[in-house]
């Protein structure tokens, strides 16, 4: 990008409007290619993205050396995958879960239970001698103490592997009724029928040890936005079954006797009186407030579910949203919007704001754009 533009959007009343455009001193290099459904991790001043639409590729951007742009680093040594989760301990990035084909020739994808570690000093990958005890596709993770990694949510491996096998090995053209029945049976289950991971799971790399820290009082969900503050993590929205989101916001504080706390839910966007909830949203903190931006959902799914339809998103187009929400002192508000609807990219809290990278757009297009979101006290500046 030759010209970096600071786009400040006016607070919405009913439609989005640009307030003004000025030129920014900061320059946020765009990725060399589109990015979605991968992972992001932050080690010191460096942010990393990889997997998903990038295949086995990983890139790093040093926030203290922006002129170098995104640099390609060592390729991932495992199978390509989407929907994985990654967390950092020291100079290591640990990678878990995701879904893909173990071998390119395999008839169907699987949900991976393998664990990999990237050494940021040596620029090298290694496979750890362990497997996760629960499915971690779509799970959220963080390290509360720089020693262990905690996990929330995640698809059930046995159930999802069977669904992927059945749908991948059934010819839709030859057996359309059989194919549709497989979809209807899976998508028509209640949220609890999917048996997503409801426990808080801990992984201690130095001992290769997994522990169960207890059952969550909430429905398990996947694709949540996360905001990490020390030993606390805030889990924002996400899906409670395929196609159905929740507006719920909750916080987990590691080490407490009562670690869970309910927070106020996401408010409805200014264009609707219903908050469907979002999955794959961008999130972080800037100038003392929590920001949640973008995310995907199916408009109308919540009402269909409340009317008793379990396949709640049947026939509904997937919506990629542009709304930005701000939480200040426990209260949510809707403010301005992203330049376009985006979901399933990566986001990082930095000293200058929330850096968002890539994402899927409407029409299944992928974005290579990088923006900085900065709260100025009344609106979120979107710095290109």
Swiss-Prot record:
Its EC number is 5.1.3.24. Pfam families: NANM. One of its GO terms (molecular function) is racemase and epimerase activity, acting on carbohydrates and derivatives. The active site is at residue 239. InterPro entries: Kelch-typ_b-propeller (IPR015915), NANM (IPR056734), NanM_proteobact (IPR019936). It comes from the Bacteria. This is N-acetylneuraminate epimerase. It comes from Vibrio cholerae serotype O1 (strain ATCC 39315 / El Tor Inaba N16961).
């Amino acid at each position: 990008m030759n010209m970096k533009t600071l786009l400040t959007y006016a607070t919405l009343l009913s439609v989005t409007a640009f307030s003004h455009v000025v030129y920014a001193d900061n320059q946020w290099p765009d990725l060399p290619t589109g990015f979605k459904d991968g992972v992001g991790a932050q080690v010191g001043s460096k942010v990393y993205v990889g997997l998903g639409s990038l295949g086995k590729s990983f890139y790093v951007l040093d926030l203290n050396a922006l002129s170098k742009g995104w640099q390609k680093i060592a390729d991932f040594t495992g199978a390509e995958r989407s929907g994985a989760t990654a967390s950092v301990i020291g100079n290591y990035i640990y990678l878990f879960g995701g879904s893909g084909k173990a071998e390119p020739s395999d008839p169907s994808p699987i949900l991976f239970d393998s664990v990999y570690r990237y050494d940021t000093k040596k620029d090298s990958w290694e496979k750890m001698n362990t497997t996760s005890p629960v499915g971690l596709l779509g799970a959220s993770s963080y390290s509360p103490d720089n020693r262990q990694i905690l996990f929330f949510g995640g698809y059930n491996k046995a159930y999802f592997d069977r669904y992927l096998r059945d749908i991948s090995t059934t010819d839709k053209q030859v057996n359309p009724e059989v194919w549709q029945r497989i979809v209807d049976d899976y998508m028509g289950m209640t949220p609890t029928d999917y048996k997503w991971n409801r426990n808080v799971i801990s992984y201690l790399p130095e001992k290769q040890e997994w522990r169960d820290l207890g059952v969550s009082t909430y429905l398990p969900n996947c694709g949540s936005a996360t905001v990490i503050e020390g030993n606390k993590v805030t889990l924002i929205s996400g899906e409670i079954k395929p196609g159905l989101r929740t507006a719920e916001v909750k916080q987990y504080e590691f080490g407490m006797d009562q670690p869970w706390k309910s927070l106020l839910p996401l408010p409805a966007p200014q264009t609707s009186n219903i908050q469907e909830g979002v999955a794959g949203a961008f999130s972080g903190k800037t100038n003392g407030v929590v920001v949640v931006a973008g995310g995907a959902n199916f408009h109308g799914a919540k009402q269909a579910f409340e009317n008793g339809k379990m396949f709640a998103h049947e026939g509904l187009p997937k919506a990629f949203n542009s709304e930005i929400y701000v939480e200040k002192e426990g209260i949510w508000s809707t403010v301005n919007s992203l330049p376009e609807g985006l979901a399933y990219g990566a986001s990082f809290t930095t000293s200058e704001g929330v850096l968002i990278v890539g994402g899927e757009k409407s029409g299944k297009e992928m974005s290579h754009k990088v923006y900085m979101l900065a709260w100025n006290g009344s609106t979120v500046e979107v710095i290109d």
